[in-house]
Swiss-Prot record:
The lineage of its organism: Eukaryota, Fungi, Dikarya, Ascomycota, Taphrinomycotina. It comes from Schizosaccharomyces pombe (strain 972 / ATCC 24843) (Fission yeast). It holds the Pfam family Pho88. Keywords: Endoplasmic reticulum, Membrane, Phosphoprotein, Transmembrane, Transmembrane helix. This is Uncharacterized protein C589.06c. GO terms for biological process: protein insertion into ER membrane; protein targeting to ER. The chain crosses the membrane at residues 34-54, 102-122, 125-145. InterPro entries: SND3_fun (IPR012098). GO terms for cellular component: endoplasmic reticulum; endoplasmic reticulum membrane. It is found in: Endoplasmic reticulum membrane.
Length: 202
């Protein structure tokens, strides 16, 4: 099932369930807080495991790809990025951590300052669903091969009805530390494309 659809269905279900809870009851609020803390403990625990496995694999396989231009930037050409599998995965993990910490900060403001308790229940479930549909979790926790929909660079999250274009990727070189977490080439390398363009122009 599409991750966005799964999140939507889960959100609607949890919202309907949370409406039946009496958040004026201190014990209900206590359990909601406990669930939220446990949920985020699991999330950051999984992040720590992934970081350890990224460092252990130390996959220095070169990864070259074109990063799409930001929406509404007026730029037609993307940015050429040269990195390694290890650096790319570490960067993606840091983005996930920042997103989670931002969510915790917003939730803390809503609950501690504004007094809302119902969102604690929702935010105990949805981030866990997002976590276990994350590409890095699929590769480093579930040991799935980094190919197909899991090939690097990762495609942007699809909308409710699919879609989401993936930037063209080229992986060159090999690494002795590469394993199932290594990226796989989806086509000709950037160098090969440039050589073809040079031959045509000459």
């Amino acid at each position: 099932m599409n991750a966005q659809v799964l999140n939507l269905v889960a959100a609607l279900g949890v919202m309907q369930y949370s409406k039946k809870l009496d958040f004026t009851d201190p014990q209900i609020v206590y359990y909601a807080r406990a669930a939220y803390v446990i949920s985020n403990t699991i999330i950051f625990g999984v992040y720590a495991i992934i970081q350890a496995r990224i460092n252990a694999n130390n996959d220095e396989t070169p990864l070259v790809y074109e990063e799409p231009a930001p929406p509404f930037s007026g730029q037609s050409n993307g940015k050429l990025v040269t990195t390694t599998v290890k650096e790319y995965d570490s960067e993606q993990l840091q983005k996930a951590k920042r997103s989670t910490m931002m969510g915790v900060a917003i939730m803390a403001f809503m609950h501690l300052y504004m007094g809302y308790a119902q969102p604690l229940v929702i935010q105990s479930i949805l981030p866990l669903i997002s976590l276990f549909t994350n590409n890095l979790v699929s590769i480093y926790i579930f040991n799935k091969a980094a190919e197909g929909s899991l090939s690097r660079p990762f495609a942007p999250p699809a909308g409710l009805f699919g879609g989401g274009n993936k930037p063209a990727a080229a992986v060159t070189g090999t690494s002795s530390n590469s394993n199932n977490a290594s990226a796989k080439s989806d086509g000709p390398t950037i160098t090969e494309l440039n050589e073809n363009e040079t031959e045509k122009s000459s």
